[in-house]
Amino acid sequence: MGVIQAIDRLMTNPIPDGQVDDILRPQGESPLLQKGYVTTSVDALLNWARTGSMWPMTFGLACCAVEMMHAGAARLDLDRYGIVFRPSPRQSDVMIVAGTLVNKMAPALRKVYDQMPDPKWVISMGSCANGGGYYHYSYSVVRGCDRIVPVDVYVPGCPPTAEALVYGILQLQKKIWRTQTNAG
């Protein structure tokens, strides 16, 4: 099975035929379910909605940004999974930092992160964003964007493939699904 087929298998409904998807239903039998009502908790509903419509803001700084654009192109087409790249931090909930972060760009990264509405998540893409990469010992390079903003998922590679970014997004969706909100 190729990488594209594995990603499609993960993003489509992994439940075997004949079983019901229980994202919004509790375990076991309930008289409410027999009458056609769906019961769930507010946390489960919010996390389900957040994982299905992630809107990343691109923060491309170097060659990793080319692979990030490749992930949004026709071959992988993140749009069909509900992942739509947004141009403004006020419209996005995920930031993808791709490339070498230099000291002059660090305040801009923090300012853009602060403009994003809560809840917000960060994906660090590539060796340079993760820890400085090839330019680690340069005086002008920040040794990892996690020194500036909190990072939720690290995608390794120099540059990482578009499939690796999609896998990182899937891992972020799993992380969002496991989180508890303070709603309700």
Swiss-Prot record:
It catalyses: a quinone + NADH + 5 H(+)(in) = a quinol + NAD(+) + 4 H(+)(out). InterPro entries: NADH_UbQ_OxRdtase-like_20kDa (IPR006137), NADH_UQ_OxRdtase_20Kd_su (IPR006138). Its EC number is 7.1.1.-. GO terms for biological process: aerobic respiration; electron transport coupled proton transport. It is a peripheral membrane protein. Transmembrane segments: none annotated. [4Fe-4S] cluster binds at residues 63-64, 128, 158. NDH-1 is composed of 14 different subunits. Subunits NuoB, C, D, E, F, and G constitute the peripheral sector of the complex. Belongs to the complex I 20 kDa subunit family. NDH-1 shuttles electrons from NADH, via FMN and iron-sulfur (Fe-S) centers, to quinones in the respiratory chain. Couples the redox reaction to proton translocation (for every two electrons transferred, four hydrogen ions are translocated across the cytoplasmic membrane), and thus conserves the redox energy in a proton gradient. This is NADH-quinone oxidoreductase subunit B. It comes from Xylella fastidiosa (strain 9a5c). The gene is nuoB.
